[in-house]
């Protein structure tokens, strides 16, 4: 089993299906947690995978036993148990190589931020902005005369508006970087790992 630490490397290093499945599980875990905590929780859940399994085939086996996933999640103290359990049960049916934004958003507990975080970091030249507190703080630091939301917008129209503004600002501030690289630079500056 390979362990990943997405606090030290760009997730765009996800080179195969295995790594993308692992990263999507991490993306679900990181909602509401620090990247360091989510990295550890993902590892604690995934460390028992056999070398011939992918994260999703492993989870499918765990899910077959009615309460086993719930027991594992509680054992590793991941929190948000109902949301995460339902989300994991939904995502194992996705093809991480081809899933779309709409496919991800159709999964329980996967919102705009998580879906875009996954796609931005696993698709070459993806045009998304992850409106987490780091990007929003960064925007506010750049635009002292504009009021930027403190939290991720929940309405589709507001998310689309601020995503457009964030993409424009990221491209202007980091013209030589992909949006994923620019997002990682902002995260390194504003995150409490």
What are these regions (language model features)?
Residues 31, 35, 74-81, 124-125:
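Short, surface-exposed loop/turn motifs that are enriched in glycine and acidic residues
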Residues 1-73:
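Structure-specific DNA junction-binding interface
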Residues 44-108:
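Alpha-helical ds-nucleic-acid-binding substructure associated with the helix-hairpin-helix region
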Residues 26, 30-33, 78, 85, ...:
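Generic hydrophobic/packing signal
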Residues 1-22, 82-92, 99, 106, ...:
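C-terminal accessory module of base-excision DNA glycosylases/AP lyases that mediates lesion recognition
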């Amino acid at each position: 089993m390979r362990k990943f630490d997405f606090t030290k490397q760009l997730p765009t290093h996800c080179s195969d299906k295995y790594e993308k499945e692992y990263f999507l599980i991490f993306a679900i875990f990181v909602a509401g947690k620090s990247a360091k905590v989510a990295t550890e929780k993902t590892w604690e859940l995934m460390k028992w995978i056999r070398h011939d399994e992918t994260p999703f085939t492993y989870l499918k086996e765990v899910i077959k036993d009615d309460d086993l996933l719930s027991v594992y999640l509680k054992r590793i103290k991941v929190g948000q148990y109902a949301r995460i359990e339902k989300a994991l049960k939904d995502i194992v049916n996705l093809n991480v190589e081809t899933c779309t934004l709409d496919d991800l958003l159709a999964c329980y507990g996967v919102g705009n931020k998580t879906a875009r975080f996954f796609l931005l970091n696993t698709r070459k030249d993806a045009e998304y902005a992850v409106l987490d507190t780091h990007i929003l703080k960064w925007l506010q630091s750049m635009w002292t005369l504009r009021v930027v939301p403190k939290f991720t917008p929940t309405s589709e129209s507001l998310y689309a508006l601020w995503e457009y503004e964030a993409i424009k600002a990221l491209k202007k501030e980091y013209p030589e970087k992909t949006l994923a690289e620019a997002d990682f630079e902002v995260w390194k500056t504003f995150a409490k790992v």
